[in-house]
């Protein structure tokens, strides 16, 4: 079993409060879950209303499949209309 993880850092220029941030983050997480079948959570910068750090995970039987799915998530976020893409870290591990 392979677990792929993706950590994405986004800048939310239009966010004026944590409430604004939560609304944007919720929409991003829901869309990525629905489109790519990944698990999603906000994992860092929880109190900063301008920055969102999101974690995504996928379980697969092949490293290449897990990596492909997460790269598609990253690509989708790079073109998000509200959030500016700041960077990502992609990793995978084998679990016996």
Language model segments and positions:
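N-terminal first-folded block
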Residues: 1-39, 76
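C-terminal structural segments of small proteins and small subunits
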Residues: 60-96
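Short, charge-patterned binding micro-sites
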Residues: 3, 41-62, 94-95
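Short beta-strand elements
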Residues: 36-43, 84-90
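A structural signal for short, well-ordered beta-strand segments
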Residues: 6-10, 54-56, 88-92
């Amino acid at each position: 079993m392979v677990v792929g993880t993706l950590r994405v850092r986004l800048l939310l220029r239009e966010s004026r409060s944590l409430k604004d941030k939560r609304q944007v983050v919720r929409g991003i997480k829901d869309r990525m879950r629905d489109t790519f079948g990944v698990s999603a959570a906000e994992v860092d910068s929880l109190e900063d209303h301008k920055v969102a750090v999101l974690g995504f995970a996928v379980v697969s039987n092949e490293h290449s499949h897990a990596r492909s799915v997460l790269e598609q998530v990253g690509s989708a976020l790079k073109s998000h209309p509200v959030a500016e893409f700041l960077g990502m870290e992609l990793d995978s591990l084998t679990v016996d």
